[in-house]
Amino acid sequence: NVSLNLLLGWDNELTYLIAPSARVPGKSYYSLNMTDSYARETFEALFCYITEKLGGNGYKHRVCNWVLGNEVNACNAWNYAGGMSTRDCAYNYAKAFQLLYQAVRGTDENARVFISLDHSWTVGQDGHSGKEYLDEFAAYMYATAPYMRWNVDYHPYSNPLYKNDF
């Protein structure tokens, strides 16, 4: 199985793709702009293109696990969102997730699409707690697209990171 993680970095010419509240250079990765129709259409076209090129049932070495973002609840460390509330951040992410899901499933009905969460389940050290974020994401998904089968890519690091005695 091949997995692919989709991340949005900074490019001065493409800042319209970044969520308006997150347009600050120098962050690791950025929250996608789902408030602007041109940005949404750009992501929709991009997702369709890459899923056609890299996914699909007809390829032996195809991408079958698609991950949108990295530890999206840690929106100060990874998917920078610029101070969005948990609900706004999760809903914005869910809208982007739905675009990717539709593109992926259009080329491969067996492929899986994942939300990526960090190890901070109850405390949001770098943004929002994983549980609260996932609850908001799930509520939006079930309200707007209950047929979508989504998956969780959970990063179970020790907390704190430097204390890994199990």
Task: Annotate the PLM regions.
Residues N1-G127, N159:
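Substrate-binding cleft and catalytic face of glycoside hydrolase catalytic domains
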Residues T122-E136, K163-F166:
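Active-site glycine- and acidic-residue-rich loops that bind
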Residues G106, E136-F166:
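Glycoside hydrolase catalytic-domain groove-lining segments
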